[in-house]
């Protein structure tokens, strides 16, 4: 009876330890890490406004994840394979959860968010200091009150978000290299593309949930529950609006910690997929083999590091692949990181709307593409070389197709004194002294305050005072300004809070942009798996983990870290009007020159992607001349495994172990 129970327990452990169970757990880890990453990316504009920081610092915060990843990627990739890989992945998930929790802390440590406005929440008909008034003395200089300046120092709490993102990057370090190498070591070579496709497709669940979560949180005011939202004079489409970004980070922290649990129950090694264990081997033999293997690993844990690095450095396909990846990832990070900001400024949408559109339109085709290419490569046994040729052609086609984005654009917001004159004539450049005009010089208005109103003539103004408005009716977001001397229209010369919305033709262009994005996302996902398989097969099996880690190291140090920083700095140069803090320091940008923004957003990534096809072309040439090391090793491994399986089937009969499928298949593989 005891032997039967032991056999049942052993069978249960072996079933739990199969590669597909690990694939499921790793997919959950991919979901949790991509959930955290995509949510972070969707909340960048909210963080920028919360802490009143420029886009370059936002890029630094976003790139700090790569800094954390960079600190350990080489060590984890090499030494991690000689340790317990599943447990290291589990520890990484826990660290990611702690990093997400730290990122939410500033909300609880700092005071309420105070947005820049000329209107008091308690403004009424008798309190009209924000309107146009003649012979009034207004202080055009910012306050120098030390108490106010100390209060603004709380904006430095963005450093908590920076450090939390670094910790999140440290936690994610072991997941990809150790997870992929674990699957590659114990899965059939023909199943690897399918499994990686499942991983990448499953990973898309995280971004979908993350973007939905981001859209939900962006609609909720940051201080919900502690302020009366009826008193707010801004809406989610306003560039001063800050959503409840901190809620999502708490959710991400919990999800990451939960997904860590299964990895602590996986063994260090698994039997090769498709082969059965020799269960007749005694437990003493197993323990002796494990002891000898552990001693051998401890002796060689460092001696192979430098030879492996030299071998990888002398691998031309591998080095060209790193160069291609660096250029492609630079372009991808630049476009994806600031895509929400671009759509907000280009098409006049709120963060909540933009994030939802990205999730609905871009992620499903990516998921379908990952699964489709993995299935096709397995079903039709497409070699890595053929897949690489196909990926190159499709990627080049998608790149040429992306140039249509240059024709799908909208004009600047029509803001008097910034992008147009008060007569509605567009300015080629922003000229600060044009903020004041004959219609508002008598009003003694603050010229550096951003509290826009939309006139019934279709023009926006930086404030009700600069629009020459002398009267207000209503409260909160329903406030209406009347008798506005700068608004020349056939109506009553009135204005409402907020920028004027862009026309219906701009909404149509947004639809075309999204259609192009769907096509581009689908083609991108189809080309991603073959490219990754080339990476796995162009290096020797014993160098695989280090090769993956070195590839990740180079893409992070030359793309992941600098790309959002320099791209954010370039975007800052297109800003037309900066918010003003109480001590006179510039805050977050309120409005951009969308024409310059569009050129930077589209031209720079196009140049980077275009240059990446030159090393990619050389990779195809080299692949025609040489056999990839991974393919050679894979064939030899399968040959040895098939011979061993046949021998065991002939000599042993252990609990009905199935035999080789047929002799013809064996001869074919031999």
From Swiss-Prot:
Main subcellular location of this protein, as a coarse class: membrane
Record key words, sorted: Cell membrane, Disulfide bond, Glycoprotein, Ion transport, Lipid transport, Membrane, Transmembrane, Transmembrane helix, Transport
Family: Belongs to the organo anion transporter (TC 2.A.60) family.
Name this polypeptide is given: Solute carrier organic anion transporter family member 1A5
Membrane topology, Cytoplasmic segments: 1-20, 81-86, 185-203, 268-311, 378-381, 537-545, 624-670
Entry's transmembrane regions: 21-40, 60-80, 87-111, 156-184, 204-224, 243-267, 312-333, 354-377, 382-405, 514-536, 546-571, 606-623
Organism, scientific name: Mus musculus
Single GO biological process annotation from the record: monoatomic ion transport
Disulfide bond entries: 439-469, 445-465, 454-486
UniProt topology in membrane: Multi-pass membrane protein
InterPro entries: Kazal_dom, Kazal_dom_sf, MFS_dom, MFS_trans_sf, OATP
């Amino acid at each position: 009876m005891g032997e039967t129970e032991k056999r049942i327990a052993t069978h249960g452990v072996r079933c739990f330890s199969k590669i597909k169970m690990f694939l499921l757990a790793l997919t959950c880890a991919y979901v949790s890490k991509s959930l955290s990453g995509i949510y972070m990316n969707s909340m960048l504009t909210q963080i920028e406004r919360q802490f009143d920081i420029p886009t370059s610092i936002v890029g630094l915060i976003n790139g700090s994840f790569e800094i954390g990843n960079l600190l350990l990627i080489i060590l984890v990739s090499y030494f991690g394979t000689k340790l317990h890989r599943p447990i290291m992945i589990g520890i990484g998930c826990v660290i990611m959860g702690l990093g997400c929790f730290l990122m939410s802390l500033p909300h609880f440590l700092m005071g309420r968010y105070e947005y820049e406005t000329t209107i008091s929440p308690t403004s009424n008909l008798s309190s009209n200091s924000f309107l146009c008034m003649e012979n009034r003395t207004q202080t055009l200089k910012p306050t120098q009150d030390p108490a106010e300046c100390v209060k603004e120092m709380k904006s430095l709490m963005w450093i908590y978000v920076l450090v939390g993102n670094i910790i999140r990057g440290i936690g994610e370090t072991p997941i990809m290299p150790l997870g992929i190498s674990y699957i590659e070591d114990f899965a059939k070579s023909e199943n690897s593309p399918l499994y990686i496709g499942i991983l990448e497709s499953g990973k898309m669940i995280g971004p979908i949930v993350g973007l939905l979560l981001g859209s939900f949180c962006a609609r909720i005011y940051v201080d919900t529950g502690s302020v009366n939202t009826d008193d707010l004079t801004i809406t989610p489409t306003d560039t001063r609006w800050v959503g409840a970004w901190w809620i999502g980070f708490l959710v991400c922290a919990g999800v990451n910690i939960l997904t860590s649990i299964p990895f602590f129950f996986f063994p260090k090694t698994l039997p090769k997929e498709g082969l059965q264990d020799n269960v007749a081997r005694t437990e003493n033999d197993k323990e002796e083999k494990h002891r000898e293997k552990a001693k051998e690993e401890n002796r060689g844990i460092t001696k192979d590091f430098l030879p492996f690095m030299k071998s990888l450095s002398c691998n031309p396909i591998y080095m060209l692949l790193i160069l291609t990846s660096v250029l492609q990832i630079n372009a991808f990070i630049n476009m994806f990181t600031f895509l929400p900001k671009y759509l907000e400024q280009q098409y006049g949408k709120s963060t909540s709307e933009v994030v939802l559109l990205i999730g609905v339109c871009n992620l499903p085709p990516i998921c379908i593409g990952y699964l489709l290419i993995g299935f096709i490569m397995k079903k039709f046994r497409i070699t890595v070389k053929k897949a690489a040729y196909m990926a190159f052609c499709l990627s080049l086609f998608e790149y040429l197709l992306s140039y249509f984005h240059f024709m799908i654009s909208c004009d600047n917001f029509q803001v008097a004194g910034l992008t147009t004159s008060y007569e509605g004539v567009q300015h080629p450049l922003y000229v600060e002294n044009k903020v004041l005009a004959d219609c508002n010089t008598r009003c003694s208005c603050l010229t550096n305050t951003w509290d826009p109103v939309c006139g019934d003539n279709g023009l926006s103004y930086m404030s009700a005072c600069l629009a020459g408005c002398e009267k207000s009716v209503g409260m909160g977001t329903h406030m209406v300004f009347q008798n506005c001397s700068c608004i020349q229209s056939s109506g009553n010369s009135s204005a409402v809070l907020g920028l004027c919305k862009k026309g219906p033709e701009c909404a149509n262009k947004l639809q075309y942009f999204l259609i192009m994005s769907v096509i581009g996302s689908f083609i991108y996902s189809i080309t991603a798996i073959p490219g990754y398989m080339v990476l796995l097969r162009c290096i020797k099996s014993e160098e695989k983990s280090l090769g993956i880690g070195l590839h990740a190291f180079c893409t992070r140090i030359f793309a992941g870290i600098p790309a959002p920083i320099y791209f954010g700095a370039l975007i800052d140069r297109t800003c037309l009007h900066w918010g003003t803090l109480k001590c006179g320091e510039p805050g977050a940008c309120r409005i951009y020159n969308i024409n310059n923004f569009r050129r930077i957003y589209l031209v720079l990534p196009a140049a980077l992607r275009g240059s990446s096809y030159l090393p990619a072309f050389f990779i195809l040439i080299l692949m025609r001349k040489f056999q990839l090391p991974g393919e050679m090793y894979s064939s030899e491994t399968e040959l040895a495994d098939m011979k061993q399986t046949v021998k065991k089937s002939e000599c042993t009969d252990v609990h009905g172990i199935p035999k080789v499928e047929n002799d013809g298949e064996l001869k074919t593989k031999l």
